[in-house]
Amino acid sequence: MAEVSIDQSKLPGVKEVCRDFAVLEDHTLAHSLQEQEIEHHLASNVQRNRLVQHDLQVAKQLQEEDLKAQAQLQKRYKDLEQQDCEIAQEIQEKLAIEAERRRIQEKKDEDIARLLQEKELQEEKKRKKHFPEFPATRAYADSYYYEDGGMKPRVMKEAVSTPSRMAHRDQEWYDAEIARKLQEEELLATQVDMRAAQVAQDEEIARLLMAEEKKAYKKAKEREKSSLDKRKQDPEWKPKTAKAANSKSKESDEPHHSKNERPARPPPPIMTDGEDADYTHFTNQQSSTRHFSKSESSHKGFHYKH
């Protein structure tokens, strides 16, 4: 292979080559910086445009919401105004009806007053026919009437107020009668409740007394059983039982009692001193309780009779 020959005389120097490389490097760096600046500017423009578009959308949405709120507010104002108009119309109609009713009532009152006046005039004429009047009384009576037969306002008011007074008196009497009946019903209900409460209380006392008697009877049976068990353990008990058996056989030979006679009550069990004291205390307490309940029930029954 043939070698390429290089002319050494035409080669540039080292400094020139370094300077050319530095210029080339600076040019490349400037070009890259310029491209970065252009890209950054484009990116910032894109971001700005996006923000502007977003802001426009938000502003448009807010404007639409504001318009909707204003439209709803105006609609609400219109509805309220319409309701107020309807209420005012209803009130006006009610006032008109009330005025018409008042006018009719006034007309009725005037008719009643006129009828009362005519009736009074007729009665006055009848009295004049039966009894002669004195001049002073006639002058005083004529002063209440007009020449055409009408009544003065004060007399008309008295004539109108007469039926209202009678109606008020009837209403008071009716209210008093209703109050009296209600009071009687309340007293009867109270008496019935008191009697029912007394009956329930007596039943409860009887139930408690029966339960106490059952408990006392059970305790007495248990004590009798325990005393019999103790006696069985005692060696001296057998002769006594034999004597009791002989006495029972003798009693069985005797004639029986009639059915109408009450059977004899069994003898109480033999108790110790402590048990005897407890039983007497219980019987005394039970008898006092019975006496108190009977006296209380009789007192309450007497109170109910009164």
From Swiss-Prot:
It is found in: Cytoplasm. GO terms for cellular component: ciliary basal body; cytoplasm; cytosol. It comes from Homo sapiens. The keyword Oxidoreductase does not apply. The modification N-acetylalanine is found at A2. Isoform 1 and isoform 2 are coexpressed in placenta, liver, lung, kidney and pancreas. Only isoform 1 is detected in skeletal muscle, brain and heart. Found in a critical region of hereditary spastic paraplegia (HSP) SPG14 locus. No causative CCDC50 mutations were found in HSP families. Phosphorylated on tyrosine residues. This is Coiled-coil domain-containing protein 50. The lineage of its organism: Eukaryota, Metazoa, Chordata, Craniata, Vertebrata.
